[in-house]
Swiss-Prot record:
The gene is Ufc1. One of its GO terms (biological process) is reticulophagy. One of its GO terms (molecular function) is UFM1 conjugating enzyme activity. It comes from Drosophila melanogaster (Fruit fly). Interacts with Uba5 (via C-terminus). Interacts with Ufl1. Gene3D superfamilies: Ubiquitin Conjugating Enzyme (3.10.110.10). The active site is at 116 (glycyl thioester intermediate). Belongs to the ubiquitin-conjugating enzyme family. UFC1 subfamily. E2-like enzyme which forms an intermediate with UFM1 via a thioester linkage. As part of Ufm1 cascade, might play a role in the development of the neuromuscular junctions. This is Ubiquitin-fold modifier-conjugating enzyme 1. PANTHER family: UBIQUITIN-FOLD MODIFIER-CONJUGATING ENZYME 1. Disruption phenotype: RNAi-mediated knockdown shows aberrant neuromuscular junctions in the larval muscle, and abnormal wings together with locomotive defects in the adult. CDD domains: UBCc_UFC1.
Length: 164
C-alpha cells in the first residue's frame, strides 16, 4: 500500500512513544515535545530534499494547529491555509486536517474543508498508535491528498493561480 518514496519519507520521521492526548495534562507536555521534534525533523528532511511544502504552528496548549501548505504545479505555487484541532481522544484518533478555502470544491472533502482520509490513512494510523503523530499525518494524509486533488482542481478550473 505504501510506495518506496513514502516508505523512505516515513523512515526518516521519528516515531513517537508517549501515548497521551490533551486530557492527560502532565504527560501531554511530553507528547507535545515529541511531536515538535518529529515535525522539525520532517521539515528539515523536506528542505534538504527540495520538497519543503508546509509550515505549522500551534496554540500554547498544542491543541489547535494552523499554518500554510503549498503545492507546486507547472512551476506555479498554490498556497492554502491549513488547520486542525487535536482530538481529545488523540493519539487514538487522528487529527482531521482542513483546508478551509477549498471547502465544497471537491468530493474528497467534508464540511468545513476537512480532507477525506478515511479509506487509506485512518486504518494505517490505527495500526500505528501511538507511534504516529502530526508529522506522520502531514506525510501520509495531507501530502498525498494534495498530490492527487490539487492538479485535478487546477485542470478543472476550480482553483486558479493567484499572483502575490
Amino acid at each position: 500500500m505504501v510506495d518506496d518514496s513514502t516508505r523512505k519519507t516515513l523512515s526518516n520521521i521519528p516515531l513517537l512513544q508517549i501515548r497521551a492526548g490533551p486530557r492527560e495534562k502532565d504527560v501531554w507536555v511530553q507528547r507535545l515535545k515529541e511531536e515538535y521534534q518529529a515535525l522539525i525533523k520532517y521539515v528539515e528532511n523536506n528542505k534538504q530534499s527540495g520538497s519543503d511544502w508546509f509550515r505549522l504552528e500551534s496554540n500554547k496548549e498544542g491543541t489547535k494547529w494552523f499554518g500554510k501548505c503549498w503545492y507546486m504545479h507547472n512551476l506555479l505555487k498554490y498556497e492554502f491555509d491549513v488547520e486542525f484541532d487535536i482530538p481529545v481522544t488523540y493519539p487514538t484518533t487522528a487529527p482531521e486536517i482542513a483546508l478551509p478555502e477549498l471547502d465544497g470544491k471537491t468530493a474528497k472533502m467534508y464540511r468545513g474543508g476537512k480532507i477525506c482520509l478515511t479509506d487509506h490513512f485512518k486504518p494505517l494510523w490505527a495500526r500505528n498508535v501511538p507511534k504516529f503523530g502530526i508529522a506522520h499525518a502531514m506525510a501520509l494524509g495531507l501530502a498525498p491528498w494534495l498530490a492527487v486533488e490539487i492538479p485535478d482542481l487546477i485542470e478543472k478550473g476550480i482553483i486558479t493561480y493567484k499572483e502575490k
